């Protein structure tokens, strides 16, 4: 009796299990059917929006939906279908040809070699006779489209030309000559939904598993680097249904993060508050027939990607008190875990300091002597670098030197002083003669009337203004006080480069006024007649005249100039006077270069001034210098053109 009771009881349990399985399967089928209806409705809405060209298309007329309804009744067995907005072509072969049939087909027998067109896109000649071939690949188990037409085919908006092959999937939209159609496989809605869900679930599982498995690296008393909301999302996404009760969330967190097993800091209250206050989480009712009480928690779809992205981020930096590496260890039987990306450290290493001799201060550089500041120094300095370091301003700066000459004077005695000055106190502005864009006319060596050489050495009137005496060749004698002139020119006549320069017009006027005052204050001298047949190198002897006769001649010349019909204004006279001075200075420099003789070197400062050979009969030259000596008096044997 007991055996029969046990058998009847077991049969009763087995019947109940079968009924339960049948009910579950029926419910699942109903859910899948409803889901397919929804997805098929979405596909139908997309197909209805496909474009149809205005010109005639045979495939649209031959396979319109109305004709298909007349041909077929009920379900249609086909491998796939090309669905347009008003037509549908069912694929019943594993290889079909898309093209255009000839307008006038020839009798049978002649076109036996030609392949039959399955989908006729004529009569438009935009489509080739054999435009494309769609066939099923048995090896890869995929549908492929090979293009043969000259105008190509667009698949999902991308143009594929002749000779190219594209893989077709369910939902791919093809466009031929402006006609759009969708390639749909059987149960495409279910397949598409399954593929998308599978891809998403795989991505979620991979991301969540990577984040969850990091918990194995956190032992006791090691707090995980995630916020409560992220840990809740990890727990929910780890389940197959993406739903979890509150108690299961507690157990999942305490299982994967041992820190929360021993701590009693009220983390469960924090979890509960996050679920109720965070809008990313919502309550979901249990399935019908599911055991248990209470509702489950899930993630709002809009925030799902956000939580997945947060799990990808590197955990926050640990404190120095617990320098535990965040590298995941590969365990046996578990998938390889991704290595967290460590934050990049900035290169804070200080470059090696260069020797002090490699850098050159700006005071040692001029536009004419550039240096590479950052170049590494060598033990021995080349001769060219030494010359650059001992550069000194020329003592005699003329207009020709500044414009066309680059041979600067080098003073060997001042080399050590220049090197010390580079690292000492600031140097005055006179050390920078060409360091600022100053007017170069300030550097012209205008001869001082008191320092002019003796009479007869050269002609002060420009050859252009006095063509009668243009045949004279000038020579300059040794200066009596070179030190005084050097200091005067080296200081640039009291001009400060920092504060700037005065205008050229005011400078001309001041120079002319100085010249006139010196002429009026100095004693007058007369020039003697010279022998016109003498050598051009020889200097003419001049005899002094009485004071009264000299004054008389000067007054006569002034009266002639005042009574001249070609009177000039004050500004023109000043300009002419300054121009004459500049011409005379340039001529002096030229003659100085021609008649300069080599002199023996000496240690004294006066040896730096070039020595000029004394002209013949130089002992009879008048030692007193006067501006009147530079006014050329017309000779008696020369008639004036006036």
Curated annotation (Swiss-Prot):
Residues 96-160 form the FHA domain. GO terms for cellular component: chromatin; M/G1 phase-specific MADS box-forkhead transcription factor complex; nucleus. Residues 223-318 bind DNA. Its main location: nucleus. It is found in: Nucleus. Phosphorylated. Occurs periodically during mitosis. Residues 310-319 have a biased composition (Basic residues). Gene3D superfamilies: 2.60.200.20, Winged helix-like DNA-binding domain superfamily/Winged helix DNA-binding domain (1.10.10.10). GO terms for molecular function: DNA-binding transcription activator activity, RNA polymerase II-specific; DNA-binding transcription factor activity, RNA polymerase II-specific; DNA-binding transcription repressor activity, RNA polymerase II-specific; RNA polymerase II cis-regulatory region sequence-specific DNA binding. Residues 363-381, 519-552, 599-642 have a biased composition (Polar residues). Disulfide bonds: none annotated. It comes from the Eukaryota. The modification Phosphoserine is found at residues 319, 321-322, 334, 336, 375, 535, 626. GO terms for biological process: division septum assembly; negative regulation of cell cycle switching, mitotic to meiotic cell cycle; positive regulation of induction of conjugation with cellular fusion; positive regulation of transcription by RNA polymerase II; regulation of transcription by RNA polymerase II. Keywords: Activator, Cell cycle, Cell division, DNA-binding, Mitosis, Nucleus, Phosphoprotein, Septation, Transcription, Transcription regulation. Residues 1-23, 310-392, 519-574, 586-642 are annotated as: Disordered. SUPFAM superfamilies: SMAD/FHA domain (SSF49879), Winged helix' DNA-binding domain (SSF46785). Residues 348-362 have a biased composition (Low complexity). Coiled coil: none annotated. PANTHER family: CHECKPOINT SUPPRESSOR 1-LIKE, ISOFORM A-RELATED, FORK HEAD PROTEIN HOMOLOG 2. Required for promoter sequence element PCB-driven, M-phase-specific transcription. Acts as a transcriptional activator with a role in the regulation of mitosis. Binds, cooperatively with mcm1, the CLB cluster regulatory elements throughout the cell cycle. Regulates the periodic transcription of cdc15 and spo12. Required for the correct timing, positioning and contraction of the division septum. This is Fork head protein homolog 2. It comes from Schizosaccharomyces pombe (strain 972 / ATCC 24843) (Fission yeast).
């Amino acid at each position: 009796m007991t055996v029969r009771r046990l058998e009847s009881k077991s049969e009763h349990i087995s019947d109940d299990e079968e009924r339960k399985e049948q009910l579950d399967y029926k419910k699942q089928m109903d859910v899948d059917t409803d889901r397919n209806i929804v997805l098929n409705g979405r596909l139908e809405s997309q197909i209805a929006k496909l474009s149809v060209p205005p010109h005639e298309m045979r495939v649209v007329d031959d396979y319109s939906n109305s004709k298909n309804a007349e041909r077929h009744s009920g379900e249609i067995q086909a491998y796939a279908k090309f669905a347009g907005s008003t037509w549908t072509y069912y694929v019943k072969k594993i290889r079909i040809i898309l093209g255009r049939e000839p307008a006038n087909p020839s009798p049978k027998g002649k076109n036996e070699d030609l392949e039959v067109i399955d989908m006729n896109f004529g009569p438009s000649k935009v489509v080739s006779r054999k435009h494309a071939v769609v066939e099923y690949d048995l090896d890869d188990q995929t549908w492929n489209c090979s293009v043969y037409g000259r105008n190509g085919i667009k698949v999902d908006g991308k143009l594929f030309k002749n000779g190219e092959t594209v893989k077709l999937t369910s939902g791919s939209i093809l466009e031929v000559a402006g006609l759009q159609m969708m390639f749909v496989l059987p149960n495409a809605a279910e397949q598409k939904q399954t593929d998308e869900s599978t891809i998403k679930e795989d991505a979620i599982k991979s991301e969540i598993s990577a984040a969850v498995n990091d918990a194995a690296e956190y032992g006791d008393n090691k707090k995980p680097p995630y916020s409560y909301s992220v840990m809740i999302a990890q727990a929910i996404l780890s389940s197959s249904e993406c739903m979890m009760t509150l108690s299961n969330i507690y157990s999942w967190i305490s299982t994967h993060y041992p820190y929360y097993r021993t701590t009693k800091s009220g983390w469960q209250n924090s979890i509960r508050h996050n679920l109720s206050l965070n809008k990313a989480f919502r309550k979901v009712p249990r399935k019908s027939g599911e055991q248990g009480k209470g509702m489950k928690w899930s993630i709002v779809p809009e925030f799902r990607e956000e939580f997945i992205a947060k799990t990808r981020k590197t955990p926050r930096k640990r404190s120095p008190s617990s320098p535990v590496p965040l590298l995941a260890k590969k365990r046996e039987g578990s998938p390889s875990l991704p290595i967290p990306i460590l934050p990049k450290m900035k290169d804070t290493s200080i470059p090696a300091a260069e020797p002090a001799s490699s850098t050159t201060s700006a005071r040692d550089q001029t536009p004419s002597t550039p240096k590479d500041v950052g170049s590494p120094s060598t033990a021995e300095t080349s001769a060219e670098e030494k010359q650059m370091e001992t550069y000194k301003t020329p003592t005699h700066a003329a207009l020709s030197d500044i414009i066309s000459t680059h041979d600067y004077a080098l003073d060997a005695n001042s080399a050590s002083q220049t090197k010390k000055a580079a690292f000492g106190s600031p140097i005055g502005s006179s050390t920078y003669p060409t360091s600022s864009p100053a007017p170069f006319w300030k550097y012209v060596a205008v001869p001082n009337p008191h320092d002019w050489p003796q009479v007869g050495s050269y002609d002060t009137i420009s050859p252009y203004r006095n063509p009668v005496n243009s045949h004279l060749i000038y020579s300059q004698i040794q200066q009596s006080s070179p030190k005084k002139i050097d200091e005067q020119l080296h200081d640039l006549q009291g001009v400060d480069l920092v504060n700037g320069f005065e205008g050229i017009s005011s400078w001309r006027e001041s120079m002319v006024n100085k010249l006139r005052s010196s002429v009026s204050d100095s004693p007058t001298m007369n020039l003697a007649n010279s022998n016109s047949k003498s050598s051009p190198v020889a200097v003419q002897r001049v005899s002094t005249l009485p004071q009264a006769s000299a004054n008389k001649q000067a007054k006569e010349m002034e009266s002639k100039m005042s009574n001249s019909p070609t009177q000039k204004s004050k500004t023109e006279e000043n300009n002419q006077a300054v121009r004459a001075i500049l011409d005379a200075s340039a001529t002096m420099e030229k003659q100085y270069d021609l008649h300069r003789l080599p002199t023996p070197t000496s240690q004294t400062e006066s040896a730096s001034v070039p020595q000029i050979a004394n002209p013949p009969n130089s002992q009879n030259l008048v030692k007193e210098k006067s501006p009147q000596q530079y006014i050329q008096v017309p000779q008696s044997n020369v008639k004036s053109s006036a």
